[in-house]
Amino acid sequence: MANKREFPLDKTRNIGIMAHIDAGKTTTTERILYYTGKIHKIGETHEGASQMDWMEQEQERGITITSAATTAEWKGNRVNIIDTPGHVDFTIEVERSLRVLDGAITVLDAQSGVEPQTENVWRQATTYGVPRIVFVNKMDKLGANFDYSMTTLEDRLQANAHAVQMPIGAEDEFQGVIDLIEMQADIYDEDELGAKWDTVDVPADYLEEATKRRAELVEAVADVNDDIMDKYLEGEEISKEELKAAIRQATIDLKFFPVFAGSAFKNKGVQMLMDGVVDYLPSPLDVRPYNAKNPEDDSEVELMAGDDKPFAGLAFKIATDPFVGRLTFFRVYTGTLQSGSYILNATKDKRERVGRLLQMHSNHRNEIPEVFSGDIAAAIGLKNTTTGDSLTDVDHPLILESMEFPDPVIQVSVEPESKEDRDKLDLALQKLAEEDPTFKAETNNETGETLISGMGELHLDIMVDRMRREFKVVAKIGEPQVAYRETFTKQASAQGKFVRQSGGKGQYGDVWVEFTPNEEGKGFEFEDAIVGGVVPREYIPSVEQGLKESMANGVLAGYPLIDVKAKLYDGSYHDVDSNESAFKIAASMALKNAAKQAGAEILEPIMKVEVIAPEEYLGDIMGQVTARRGAVEGMEARGNAQIVNAMVPLSEMFGYATTLRSATQGRGTFTMVFDHYSAVPKSIQEEIIKKNGGQ
């Protein structure tokens, strides 16, 4: 018998909490769980006791690495929350949680406003069309400035963000917030851990400013809502309900971003933020339809949430749990799913059996018999499913829009101590790569060396740490190296002909391929332009495969060749001696032959770097950037500090943290994000080729 759903769809919210590192995101999530009755004791991140940060490394480092999913209840609504990491190395975690969310809270530090990683996740959220509300946190902190934070939203994100609250006081005088829609003040009782507050009239000394800000808010809402605009121009009264409904609609349409204020650490403003989640962020019924494809005829399908439709969901994370093994986190878009039933992994075209279904609270779990449209849950028992796979009803296959994962930019070598460690290492690498699509492991067939690559030094540190702790691998870890790429800069055509006669059956494959540089980021594209069957149909996939395999090893120094188009336009075959492997080898020969005329170049990752330091160190920092082949893109003052924005090659950034620390007596900090690939200077290219014993 079917179970009844506990919360209707319009009372469901799937939200993420995203921010720059140290903006107080995990603390905000903790407080939400505390006030919604999920936790009985508040855990502080800086004491290493936080509920959401459940991996050992997270508690030691005080940062969030994996997106823990948890379910809370607020005023008759179910709120599924995904806590995402703020550190740039873990952008993938943010990216994949955004894919399955309907809305998000962006947390800002009231002193710093919008920071580099905030810009990153904001851009990602815009790409996925995720509506957001903003929480200006740490209003109790020295230097907290609500208006400055508001300015950075406009200047750095070009966001149409408007305050629906204003803070009462700041720094150690921060007492609560004024609700600009209700025109009431919520003032907190200092002793009650934020569980009690008084709702009173706006204090007299704030009335003028609050009235002015409310008028600005109404005007901003009128700009994005015609009905409100008409009333505004006619001078008619706009009710609170109309104002809220208009803000909700504009937020869902990504035209408006409501801003809240508070201090999660001091337990102020979190309940009003939760009201904001319910009031302004969409339920699964409010968001645009989800795009899907029918794999049988490639037709486009639009999915609207509802329990009465066939089951369709998306796996967005794989985690290994010490007690139950492999967990697949997934979002249900349509239909329902019962534990014990069979589903189709439509991406891989494989049937899977759902063992048990769990709803997660951080890393505690409740077993549930059934999940409904709009739910986020974890399944045990899915053997073939990886991140980004579509899970559907067996008779209604659909492929949901998947996720795009950036390529890793940094790598280290791993050398196991013993044969036994080699086996453990292989298992560890397989499991870790299943969990994290931006973590890659490959063994060089010629040297036998294993290289692991990821999004940054911290990312790889944590992966190595997990290999040691969870899989007990003993291994030597090399120095970090840059994940270079290779590409062609000119058009070139070449023949690849492989003929072998040595008694018995011979080998024969012959192809002509034209190579052209492709647009940056477009990857490898293959075109079959064979006319008249000079290369038989059945061998064409082998030609493409042969090109792909030899591109993986590059043509100059062994780095993958990217952004190249290959057009197979001529060739010949032998009735008896031709086979798939001969054409595969012929294709790789064509690539090698073309490389000589195609202007092959080595590309290096260029990072967008932001350095923040007191003004007196500005000269030193500019000098350091230039010495590292960097280009300064701009500078701005923030308080008494200077911010330098620059583009610097990743290879020059190793060890920069130490250099910056000693140059600024520990007062400077920096963040970096991968931006693009660019050709390395000729002299450096020659060094790299020589070092790798390349061509």
Swiss-Prot record:
CC terms in the record's Gene Ontology section: cytoplasm
One biological process term in Gene Ontology: ribosome disassembly
Domain of life: Bacteria
Any Pfam family matching the protein: EFG_IV
SMART domains: EFG_C (SM00838), EFG_IV (SM00889)
Record-linked InterPro entries: EF-G-like_DII, EFG_II, EFG_III, EFG_III/V, EFG_IV, EFG_V, EFG_V-like, G_TR_CS
UniProt-annotated location(s): Cytoplasm
Residues reported to bind GTP: 19-26, 83-87, 137-140
Record function comment: Catalyzes the GTP-dependent ribosomal translocation step during translation elongation. During this step, the ribosome changes from the pre-translocational (PRE) to the post-translocational (POST) state as the newly formed A-site-bound peptidyl-tRNA and P-site-bound deacylated tRNA move to the P and E sites, respectively. Catalyzes the coordinated movement of the two tRNA molecules, the mRNA and conformational changes in the ribosome.
Protein name: Elongation factor G
Natural source organism: Latilactobacillus sakei subsp. sakei (strain 23K)
